[in-house]
Amino acid sequence: MQHYSVSRRIRRLTIAALSTLLASAAAVTVSAPAHADITPTTLVNGVLSTIGGCQSPVRDAIVGCTRMETLTTQFPVVLDLNQLGTNIVVLGAGLFPDGTMRPVLISRLQAALQVARRYPLSPIIVSGGVPKNGITEAGAMRAWLIANGIPWFRITEENTSRSTVENARNTNGILAGRGATSAVVVTSPDHLQRAMVDFRTAVAGRIPVAGVVAP
């Protein structure tokens, strides 16, 4: 019953806020570069991730709101609204015993690379510990991004986490320390919804958290 009530309130907020965001998005469309992914999906997700209920200190509200979002490879509008303050967060996945990356992690990095190239002012955080052969997930991700043309100074390693919950908690410390205004989490389709719930819970409503699915 409580979940139903929360979901109903979220829907009311979403409907009420959508016209406002549409007006804002229209302004962005005029002033922002043509690369902005402003579509019905990203607009609705943008409402939900901010005033629609996902930016909340209440976990039940976060869970209900996050379930209403559409997982997509399209880039969130928050990146165009504040590129410099939005951090791109790439989540790790278990390495092979020799320290090399599994295909699932390379897929996440390829998706993050597209975001990073389109938004060259956005800082990047690579999150993951669990070392194999002396190499952490974050270390492997950082090396891959640098090898693919991302400047080293854009990348911050969070190399101690061992779970998605720890990814969120540890990365939140970095985001808070640098005064980030929002975060975009990049991970696999079967991981993103849970990851966004964990990150939104960790930031406790301080900043909006959006997501990008790795194909």
Predicted regions and their residues:
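A structural signal for short, hydrophobic/glycine-enriched beta-strand patches
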Residues: 2, 35-215
